[in-house]
Curated annotation (Swiss-Prot):
HAMAP family linked: Ribosomal_uL30_B
Name this protein carries in UniProt: Large ribosomal subunit protein uL30
Any one Gene Ontology cellular component term annotated for this protein: cytosolic large ribosomal subunit
Assembly mode: Part of the 50S ribosomal subunit.
Organism annotation: Salinispora arenicola (strain CNS-205)
Keywords carried by this UniProt record: Ribonucleoprotein, Ribosomal protein
Family annotation (Pfam families): Ribosomal_L30
Amino acid sequence: MARLKVTQVRSEIGTKRNQRDSLRSLGLKRINDVVVKEDRPEIRGMIFTVNHLVKVEEVE
């Protein structure tokens, strides 16, 4: 299964509560934090919620 590398590139200050919750659920706390997650629908949904705050890359 593919994996996604998610990097937080913008601050969560001034964002809505659900966006902050999605960042925390992804394991992102501050700018330039990086996590690698499995490519699953629930992860894609969280990424879609915060797509303006993160950068996503596929990794092997």
